[in-house]
């Protein structure tokens, strides 16, 4: 969860997790919690253009998971970058930190805000513009990331107090310009149009 302070705050809100040492990560049943599947889609899209090697961030050998009585096995709601990372780089041993999934609507909303903020931080890693689909990324963010988190971000960056992610704000997070993202969108549209044209010619 980052620093000790945020870990302490997190545990205060969501309870201290039980620690399980997992020696066979492949055998453990972890699925994305359905309430958080939209945020997971945002991560999957962002991973396509990720240039930063996550192993350089010295990932701690742990993963936060949640036990929800409505679902079998463990579910995951946040820190999806590490779930994706450990799924691709199977660890020999990993500590699985098991929280009880909140049954209270306000706590679930709070967890969505936490997961949304984590995703926004993840976007500030280095991404390869040539592998990014800005329009798709923007629409996924506006569909699934907490609008309150986006509103706070717009205010922080002196943009209009909107609850949606503009291309301008997305560019700011990705450390590039709006023009670069517009150009990338045009390139993608042109490629798509070329494919459609070819299909029409062959039909």
Give a label for each model feature.
Residues 45-49, 110, 136, 169:
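Exposed alpha-helical structural elements
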Residues 15, 55-59, 116, 146, ...:
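Generic surface-pattern signal
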Residues 75, 160, 171:
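Short, flexible active-site loop motifs that bind/organize anionic cofactors or intermediates
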Residues 157-161, 179-202:
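Short, solvent-exposed alpha-helical "recognition" segments
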Residues 1-97:
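Short, charged/polar connector segments at secondary-structure boundaries
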Residues 94-163:
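Amphipathic, charge-rich alpha-helical segments that serve as recognition/docking helices
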Residues 166-172:
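Short alpha-helical "recognition helix" segments of helix-turn-helix
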């Amino acid at each position: 969860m980052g620093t000790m302070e945020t870990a302490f705050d997190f545990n205060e809100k969501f309870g201290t997790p039980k620690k399980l040492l997992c020696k066979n990560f492949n055998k453990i049943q972890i699925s994305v919690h359905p309430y958080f599947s939209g945020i997971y889609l945002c991560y999957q899209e962002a991973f396509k253009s990720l240039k930063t090697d996550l192993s350089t961030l010295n990932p701690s050998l742990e993963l936060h998971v949640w036990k929800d009585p409505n679902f079998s096995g463990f579910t995951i709601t946040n820190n999806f970058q590490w779930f994706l990372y450990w799924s691709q780089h199977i660890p020999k041993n990993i500590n699985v930190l098991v929280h009880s999934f909140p049954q209270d609507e306000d706590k679930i909303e709070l967890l969505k805000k936490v997961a949304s903020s984590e995703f926004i931080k993840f976007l500030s890693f280095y991404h390869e513009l040539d592998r990014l689909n800005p329009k798709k990324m923007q629409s996924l963010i506006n569909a699934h990331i907490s609008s309150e988190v986006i509103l706070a971000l717009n205010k922080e960056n002196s943009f209009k107090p909107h609850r949606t992610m503009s291309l301008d704000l997305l560019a700011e997070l990705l450390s590039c310009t709006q023009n670069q993202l517009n150009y990338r969108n045009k390139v993608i549209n042109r490629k798509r149009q070329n494919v459609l044209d070819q299909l029409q010619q062959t039909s």
